Design a protein with these regions (language model features):
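Hydrophobic membrane-insertion alpha-helices, especially the h-region
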Residues: 22-30
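Short glycine/proline- and charge-enriched loop/turn segments
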Residues: 108-117, 250-257, 302-303
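Metallo-beta-lactamase
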Residues: 9, 13, 17-18, 31-155, 162, 167, 187-196, 202-207, 211-218, ...
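Metal-dependent catalytic neighborhoods of phosphoester/phosphodiester hydrolases
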Residues: 158-164, 294-297
Length: 303
């Protein structure tokens, strides 16, 4: 790992104290200045957001997320991948399930290649490669300046190795999940161990102008992050990562059982809801397959 300088990022607004967990979470309000590093110049003049198809998880088991099958309209998960193109550079947010799954029957492809019982399994369906979708809009892996994951779970890091030349933007907690002393080796992102890496703290302004901000929303993982993109025409959006899995999470305030007791996910959701109210941003849940099917996909884009 080539470690770049560590930024201490000034968080927006107040700090909420999680007394039960002894942790701090920053509440986000627009208006403060963030540290950011110099970026390369891209060919576009404005900000663009491309939505790519990173595959589908076929599942009928929302109980793991605190919901029943009767409560969820569509239990399958889309695995969205996002390319943000800014005049100062490019950022890829999440990388999908993995191009290696293209052409494999979904009923023979359990999530994470784990042979789980069919009644509770998630199965993988990938019909197009992320690489080909990027090439269709003129971007090879070598043209991606920065890489960030909402978190390093299998459905978000499947193509990570293809972007090892990019600078990895990550919090220490998630980096330790990937490469720390107790980490389980995962070949899907093994190449990132030698990538340029920026350990970020709190919220992070990627390009230095407030238009693309990684929001620290821990809980699902220690370093989980969501992404704010201030689109001039479409309006601002927040890409949720796995802070929410289903749209019903919003309606019923549900979450995985393991995330309830510490209170960290709850605090991150409160932080994000305050941020949405302040900015008027739309919330995009990357696993919401019904919403994903209605979105514009690359080569179309939001700006």
């Amino acid at each position: 790992m080539r470690l770049l300088r560590v930024h201490t990022i000034r968080k927006f607004g107040l700090v909420a104290i999680l007394r039960g967990a002894g942790l701090l979470v920053g509440f986000v309000v627009i208006g403060l200045v963030f540290a950011a590093r110099p970026q390369t110049q891209s060919a576009v003049r404005g900000l663009r957001l491309y939505v790519l198809d990173g595959g589908t998880i076929i599942t009928n088991h929302p109980e793991g997320f605190g919901l029943t099958r009767e409560q969820v309209k569509n239990t399958n998960f889309s695995c969205a991948v996002y390319l943000i193109v800014h005049p100062r550079g490019t950022l890829l947010f999440d990388t999908g399930l993995g191009d290696r799954y293209v052409g494999r029957p979904f009923n023979e492809t359990p999530l994470g290649d784990r042979p789980d019982p069919p009644s509770t399994a998630g199965f993988v369906l990938v019909t197009k490669t992320v690489k080909s979708q990027l090439e269709q809009i003129g971007y090879s892996a070598s043209k991606i300046d920065d890489l960030a994951f909402s978190h390093p779970h299998d459905d978000h890091i499947g193509n990570a190795n293809d972007f090892a030349r990019a600078t990895l933007l990550i919090h220490q907690g998630d980096y330790d999940m990937m490469f720390g002393p107790k980490a389980q080796a995962n070949p899907a992102y093994a190449a990132l161990k030698n990538s340029k890496t920026e350990m970020i703290e709190g919220d992070y302004d990627v390009f230095g102008d407030g238009s693309v901000v990684l929001l620290f929303t821990p809980g699902h993982t220690p370093g989980h992050q969501s992404l704010y993109v201030k689109l001039p025409r479409n309006g601002p959006v927040v890409l949720s990562g796995d802070l929410y899995h289903y749209p019903e999470d919003l309606e019923l305030d549900s979450m995985p059982e393991r995330e309830k007791a510490p209170g960290i996910t709850e605090a991150s959701r409160k932080k994000l809801q305050a941020f949405l109210a302040k900015t008027g941003a739309q919330l995009w849940i990357g696993h919401d397959i019904n919403f994903f099917s209605r979105q514009k996909h690359a080569p179309q884009y939001y700006d």
